[in-house]
């Protein structure tokens, strides 16, 4: 199978009736015949009688070229390339209609803020950011007007303690006190009956002690030592101790200097003098 047969089978054209290659079969002529054809201005192809000769049987799909009077060369063929090119042009022209939608898809985001959901005048930034504000104001993004929100009762905060991962160890490791409602209670009667223990939260206690020692030498030679102790409860204890410093009397002669060991006479005097003194 030739390359031309493979090409025609790929595009669905019927097979040839002969094994002659139409691309180059009609071009394998003598040089003299080519010159004669050029002089006569004829064309080589299906219109040429030599093309329909028994030596060159006609085929369903032919290929040829002709010389125009102006000196140009024009190729013509019956392989169906014109239809093929026309089909490709129609396909690529239709691709222009395969455009994206005119409106791009909108990404999910926060809804537009309405005037009723804006920060109300006089409301603190903390209340606007908290899910359950401390001042029991209605939620900003709830879509409820201020006049309607005033008549509603504040929603209690949910008990998130039971949903914590280590809520089973609260009795061993107490982390946060239990949530209590924010309301005014009369504590006078409760304190008079139960005392301050149940009312006040237990506070951790720490014990420490600070000790500072200061020594001062006065001009008369007395050394004063001041010791200050401060405990965790703020009690301060200061102890002052005075004693005289060790000093030699002023009228005493100069104390003898130790002999230098590098002097041989001094070493002999040291040993011999002691021996003679002991005698």
Swiss-Prot record:
As stated in the Swiss-Prot or TrEMBL entry, residues carrying the post-translational modification Phosphoserine are 189, 192
Membrane topology value: Peripheral membrane protein
Region of interest (Involved in GNA13 binding), residue spans: 176-247
Post-translational modification summary for this protein: Proteolytically cleaved by caspase-3 during apoptosis.
The site (Cleavage) lies at 127-128
Query: In Gene Ontology terms, what is one molecular function of this protein?
Result: protein domain specific binding
User: Which residue ranges does the record annotate as region Required for localization in sarcoplasmic reticulum?
Assistant: 183-279
Query: What cellular-component terms does GO give this entry?
Result: actin cytoskeleton; apical plasma membrane; cell cortex; clathrin-coated vesicle; endoplasmic reticulum; lamellipodium; mitochondrial intermembrane space; mitochondrial matrix
Q: Region Mediates interaction with UCP3: list its residue ranges.
A: 210-279
- Indicate, by first and last residue, each region the UniProt record lists as having compositional bias (Basic and acidic residues): 115-124, 167-184, 217-255
This protein's source sits in the domain of life called Eukaryota
Q: Which residues carry this modification: N-acetylserine?
A: 2
Indicate, by first and last residue, each region the UniProt record lists as having compositional bias (Acidic residues): 30-41
- Please give the annotated consequence of changing residue 141 to L: In SCN3; mild form
Write down the disease named in this UniProt entry. Neutropenia, severe congenital 3, autosomal recessive: A disorder of hematopoiesis characterized by maturation arrest of granulopoiesis at the level of promyelocytes with peripheral blood absolute neutrophil counts below 0.5 x 10(9)/l and early onset of severe bacterial infections. Some patients affected by severe congenital neutropenia type 3 have neurological manifestations such as psychomotor retardation and seizures.
User: Which protein family is named in the record?
Assistant: Belongs to the HAX1 family.
Per the entry, what this protein does is:
Recruits the Arp2/3 complex to the cell cortex and regulates reorganization of the cortical actin cytoskeleton via its interaction with KCNC3 and the Arp2/3 complex. Slows down the rate of inactivation of KCNC3 channels. Promotes GNA13-mediated cell migration. Involved in the clathrin-mediated endocytosis pathway. May be involved in internalization of ABC transporters such as ABCB11. May inhibit CASP9 and CASP3. Promotes cell survival. May regulate intracellular calcium pools.
* Name of the protein in its database record: HCLS1-associated protein X-1
Q: Which organism is it from?
A: Homo sapiens (Human)
Gene this chain is encoded by: HAX1
């Amino acid at each position: 199978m030739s390359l031309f047969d493979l090409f025609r089978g790929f595009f669905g054209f019927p097979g040839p009736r002969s094994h002659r290659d139409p691309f180059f079969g009609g071009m394998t002529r003598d040089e003299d015949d080519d010159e004669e054809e050029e002089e006569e201005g004829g064309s080589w192809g299906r219109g040429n009688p030599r093309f329909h000769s028994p030596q060159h049987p006609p085929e369903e799909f032919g290929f040829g070229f002709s010389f125009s009077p102006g000196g140009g060369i024009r190729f013509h063929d019956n392989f169906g390339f014109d239809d093929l090119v026309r089909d490709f042009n129609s396909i690529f022209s239709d691709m222009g209609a395969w455009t994206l939608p005119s409106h791009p898809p909108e990404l999910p985001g926060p809804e537009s803020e309405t005037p009723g959901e804006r920060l109300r005048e006089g409301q603190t930034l903390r209340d606007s950011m908290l899910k359950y504000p401390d001042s029991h104001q209605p939620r900003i993004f709830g879509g409820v007007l201020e006049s309607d929100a005033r008549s509603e009762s504040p929603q209690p905060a949910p008990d998130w303690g039971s949903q914590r991962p280590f809520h089973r160890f609260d009795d061993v490791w107490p982390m946060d006190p239990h949530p209590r409602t924010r309301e005014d209670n009369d504590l006078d009667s409760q304190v008079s009956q139960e005392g301050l223990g149940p009312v006040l939260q237990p506070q951790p206690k720490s014990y420490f002690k600070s000790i500072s020692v200061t020594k001062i030498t006065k001009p008369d030679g007395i050394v004063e030592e001041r010791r200050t102790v401060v405990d965790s409860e703020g009690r301060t204890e200061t102890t002052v101790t005075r004693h005289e410093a060790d000093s030699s009397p002023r009228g005493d002669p100069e104390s003898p200097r130790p002999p230098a060991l590098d002097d041989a006479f001094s070493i002999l005097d040291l040993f011999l003098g002691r021996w003679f003194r002991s005698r």
